[in-house]
Amino acid sequence: MSNAITMGILWHLIGAASAACFYAPFKQVKKWSWETMWSVGGVVSWIILPWLISALLLPDFWAYYSSFSLSTLLPVFLFGAMWGIGNINYGLTMRYLGMSMGIGIAIGITLIVGTLMTPIINGNFDVLINTEGGRMTLLGVLVALIGVGIVTRAGQLKERKMGIKAEEFNLKKGLVLAVMCGIFSAGMSFAMNAAKPMHEAAAALGVDPLYVALPSYVVIMGGGAIINLGFCFIRLAKVKDLSLKADFSLAKPLIIQNVLLSALGGLMWYLQFFFYAWGHARIPAQYDYISWMLHMSFYVLCGGIVGLVLKEWKDAGRRPISVLSLGCVVIIIAANIVGMGMAS
């Protein structure tokens, strides 16, 4: 396995670790509605940071974006909005299926759809089937999916042992939402594929290869921001128990604390895709679809490890932890299989 591929896998792991940890600061926010907290964090992660980083990277910010036609920008924006819809459905999936089943189904579907649909859309899926390296990477995707399934099973055993139940368990509604979440969340993978002309233009301007994907986040995350912020603002305006004014009428020290914690959560959320861009840049072009598989499987892996570190599994018993450990090992094996496939 080449050093470039190894570094690509490592950057994806770091990005996934940030994704697995980003909600920790949000959990410390007090006396704010979820909608206010999510909006503040979202403004930081989806608007401020993408624009700021792009302004630092590009020699002429406005000239760069105005150089693209609407036919180039619109798919990137719409796929970003598609991801935003998946993001909203994610929370509802947890509500009706519980954390473990919801995450397992949603992540499993988005891993498959986001990974395999890209080469199908690009018309080169047959190359993957007919080459040794392609077949090995596909095997890695399958093994990763098995690993996600094992971790999901561990979560179910943990919830059963600890008596944790879904907020409003509804299998039919939850499955529909999980499938929708999985499909729509893959919009981020599709957006990255559609944004290739933007990456190439950034490279032509002298932007370092590690950073060429970052300017496209202004458009991708702009689409996601409109969906997420629109959802939050509509709820803040229509739901009687929610009030943006009330949330910002608390004592000033608490408001400052909540803003800083939400901003930190937003920063950590953004960092997952900052390092995703770094990892993506190191993956061979013919296997760039693998970036999504690495990100999602490492997200599950890091989520399990973070849960152990935070002692969320302390009262789960030995069996769930053993199953979780097995799932994590399988995901690590999958990453190695994919790495060897890309190197062959």
Curated annotation (Swiss-Prot):
Membrane topology, as annotated: Multi-pass membrane protein
Principal place of residence: membrane
Domain of life: Bacteria
Keyword Transmembrane helix in record: yes
Coiled coil: none
Transmembrane segments: 4-24, 38-58, 68-88, 101-121, 137-157, 175-195, 214-234, 259-279, 290-310, 323-343
Keywords: Cell inner membrane, Cell membrane, Membrane, Sugar transport, Symport, Transmembrane, Transmembrane helix, Transport
InterPro entries: L-rhamnose-proton_sym_RhaT
GO MF term (any one): rhamnose transmembrane transporter activity
Location of this chain's protein in the cell: Cell inner membrane
Cellular component GO terms held in the UniProt record: plasma membrane
A Pfam family hit: RhaT
Catalytic activity: L-rhamnopyranose(in) + H(+)(in) = L-rhamnopyranose(out) + H(+)(out)
NCBIfam families attached to this UniProt entry: PRK13499.1-1, PRK13499.1-3, RhaT
Record HAMAP family: RhaT
Protein family membership: Belongs to the L-rhamnose transporter (TC 2.A.7.6) family.
Function: Uptake of L-rhamnose across the cytoplasmic membrane with the concomitant transport of protons into the cell (symport system).
Protein name per the record: L-rhamnose-proton symporter
Organism: Escherichia fergusonii (strain ATCC 35469 / DSM 13698 / CCUG 18766 / IAM 14443 / JCM 21226 / LMG 7866 / NBRC 102419 / NCTC 12128 / CDC 0568-73)
Name of the encoding gene: rhaT
